[in-house]
């Protein structure tokens, strides 16, 4: 009887390939239109918080419309209906209702029923707007994921109605707002309009009911949306906001956001709103400052302006807005505001004689002012880079670099005004109290222990010459040490870091495995010896987190297998020799992106191929610019902006905290510290449990 395997032709035989051929033709490719794609993958255009982002896009458009005095409007009315739908109405110009001779679409369908459409992509003056919606997709995406949307436009003495069913334009039967009413699709509907009793009426009203099947895991937080609308109104002089509750069926709406707003406008009243919403005290005395400058975008030098209100308060409260958008993730504008404000106040406090300092006591530092400050900042910056369509943070590093010194100059001038002397004194004394509390854990107590712990530090206490030091250091300073992969990565860190609090040291290749080594044997390894001298906190039983020169130690390695090996060796070293630092939450692994997907100034950072593919799809859907994919072969090849945004910026980077796990201690010892026989046994055991039948070994 012949062996069945002998009947299989060799791989080089033509029959081998013919028998394994799979039909794959153009018919196998599924093509989706914009509505289908958005309904299938809503997070691509609207982020993870799908429903809140979608409704905010509609509200942003309305407020932006009436914020321009040339548009003839002043009021936005938000109505919460009992059926769960929301209406957003403005008394601005009213969307165009005529028909585009090229596409056959009317102006409403072009604006709210078409992705990547809007006046901001044209030569129209709206193209240089600092409004919230600049991607040309958000409001349309909101319509796409709705069960029904009715758009009513009043202009030219008439009222026009355009409906959308499940994202497509057309006509519903009946006069009630019923998403289940019979619907006829019509992409090229010509709007006739009916005469208004009041011919002077003008504006746009959008009533939208989201389709619950599209984003079942997303919930609409109407209180947060209304809070953002109130904030945007306060930053838009002349804009009035009215909220009407007709029996909202969701969670109870906070009464404060149901109140109408008719001024005053500015960051002063904005700070009141945000402190009240956060339940934190309102500062009784305040600094109100503003400024302007230029930062770098894809258009070249681009003007921006900012304004902020801040005052002494505990606990600290910060509220950051850019182009009227609330950015809970902060970003460049918030970093610049806090840095400029706190540094200017700290410099002023350093020259005060009546602060009440003890002999040889240092005054409060910038971080101490930041800890006792309530602040609201509003920045207007055309072409600003957002972290995503959800716009939770600003990622334009050049804005930070240009804005921080301008804030510092303005605050310095304000603080030098004799009329503000009492406010500066109060602020400085509150910051001094914060400084004393901060230093209590690191001052005399830490120094008193240093002598008894010194025997654990070795004899060579000089710092390695390749260490890139930070100006700040010591426990409680906020200083960070990056252990990076090689000199090339060090060069990138040097160009991108904030030298005030970020230090770096390059590792020569993979650090040695010193797990379980006697201390004298470990110190014979150059990398171990250098790290011990840099940290200055002792090792093993003598390791004291309070003596460490840095509050955080971060491993920065390439996003490849070699980088993973380096991180593994460092984690092993720290679990053995610096376990108290790990237990104190001071040790982290950075997650640099493997890919950067770009379209103009917008960038999305991706950890793997699946994130890359999703980002490419998102940018192609939201931008008419060419999409580029950059693969980062190593940290040294990243540009400074990307490195800052993804590895260095404390507000935007992704890091993983190293945590001790007692349940894995035995396995860790086997893999890193035990005899080779244990590792061979472990690998054989794992291999025996692999289902080889699922592997293609041909």
Swiss-Prot record:
Alphabetical list of InterPro entries matching this protein: DNA_gyrase_B_C, HATPase_C_sf, Ribosomal_Su5_D2-typ_SF, Ribsml_uS5_D2-typ_fold_subgr, Topo_IIA, Topo_IIA-like_dom_sf, Topo_IIA_B_C, Topo_IIA_bsu_dom2
What GO molecular function annotations does the UniProt record carry, in alphabetical order? ATP binding; DNA binding; DNA negative supercoiling activity
Q: What GO biological process terms are annotated to this protein in UniProt?
A: DNA topological change
Tagged with keyword Lyase = no
Q: Which keywords does UniProt give here?
A: ATP-binding, Isomerase, Isopeptide bond, Nucleotide-binding, Topoisomerase, Ubl conjugation
Instruction: Extract the ranges annotated as region (Disordered).
Output: 443-473
Q: Which residues form the Toprim domain?
A: 479-593
Activity control: Inhibited by quinolone antibiotic ciprofloxacin and coumarin antibiotic novobiocin, but at much higher concentrations than is usual for DNA gyrase/topoisomerase.
Q: What is its EC number?
A: 5.6.2.2
Which note does the record give on the cofactor? Maximal DNA relaxation at 5.0 mM MgCl(2).
Q: Look up the domain of life of the source.
A: Bacteria
Q: Which reaction is this enzyme known to catalyze?
A: ATP-dependent breakage, passage and rejoining of double-stranded DNA
Quaternary structure? Answer: A complex of TopoN and TopoM, possibly a heterotetramer.
- List the protein's name: Topoisomerase subunit TopoN
The encoding gene is topoN
